[in-house]
Regions:
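Outer-membrane beta-barrel translocator/channel fold
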Residues: 1-5, 9-13, 26-33, 113-161, ...
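Membrane-embedded beta-strands of outer-membrane beta-barrel proteins
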Residues: 6-8, 67-69, 99-101, 156, ...
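Short loop/turn motifs that connect adjacent beta-strands in outer-membrane beta-barrel proteins
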Residues: 13, 17-19, 78, 109, ...
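Transmembrane beta-strands of outer-membrane beta-barrel proteins
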Residues: 20-22, 81-83, 101, 110-116, ...
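Transmembrane beta-strands of outer-membrane beta-barrel pores
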Residues: 24-32, 63-65, 73-75, 85-91, ...
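Outer-membrane beta-barrel translocator domains and adjoining extracellular loop/strand segments
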Residues: 33-41, 94-99, 125-131, 189-198
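Solvent-exposed loop/turn segments connecting transmembrane beta-strands
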Residues: 59-63, 88-97, 206-209
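Outer-membrane beta-barrel "beta-signal"
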Residues: 156-158, 207-220
Length: 220
């Protein structure tokens, strides 16, 4: 596979406390783009399940374009509020909107961060939860990440600065101990959970997850 990735961005100080950044990027992928281990399903009256499976088949090229706008406003006590919006579109006819809001608040050696992220996208032109027959279309996909979906992410993070600038250890100038928790909820609007029932009675798939991270950062 080959990939070409180009991007450009501009940052502007708007006021004493407000800074904004505008970014644009385009990515082109060529080659074998689908997962050889994924399958689509199609209606099959001869199967006890009512459907059978066959391999996915994706286009061999994909070009995406995205534009993003981010603004950061600095508050008293070294706190900051950041808002971001990103629009995405590609040649597979996926269109996505992502928005997020972040608040950062230092307190002594601690820094607290809270973030909310919202993402909504349409599905790829060749995505189907189930196809009407075998080889029904030129391209076929059932990857849930290609389906229409909406996701919500809530994040909390705390960092403790145990190594202050200019008081380092040898080559290390600064060090922090970090803990974060992300709560993720994804609704797939056209992707069924085939384990939840028989054909026609399946529930739409949902993903709920908590992601914990503990790590140490050093600057040198």
């Amino acid at each position: 596979n080959t990939r070409q990735h180009y991007g450009v961005g501009v940052t502007q100080i708007l006021t004493r406390n407000l800074i904004a950044t505008l970014n644009f990027e385009t990515v082109t992928d060529e080659g074998f783009l689908n997962n050889p281990y994924r399958s689509v399903r199609y209606v099959d009256s001869g199967s006890a399940l009512g459907y059978s499976f066959e391999p996915e088949l994706y286009p061999e090229t994909r070009t995406s374009n995205a534009v993003g706008l981010r603004a950061r406003y600095f508050l008293p006590y070294r706190a900051a509020l950041e808002a971001e919006y990103r629009f995405y579109t590609d040649t597979w006819e996926i269109e996505g909107h992502t928005a997020s809001m972040t608040y950062v608040h230092p307190w002594g050696p601690f820094t607290f961060e809270g973030k909310f992220r919202y993402h909504d996208q349409t599905g790829a032109a060749f995505f189907r939860d189930i196809f009407s027959r075998s080889e029904a279309t030129n391209f076929r996909g059932r990857d849930k990440e290609l389906s229409p979906l909406t996701s919500y992410t809530f994040r909390g993070k705390v960092s403790y600065e145990f190594l202050e600038p200019n008081k380092g250890w040898g080559i290390f100038k600064r060090g922090t101990l970090n803990f974060s928790l992300d709560h993720l909820f994804v609704e797939y609007h056209e992707f069924s959970d085939i384990t939840s029932g028989s054909l026609g009675d399946e529930a739409l798939y949902e993903l709920k997850a908590n992601v914990y991270q503990v790590f140490v950062s050093f600057w040198y």
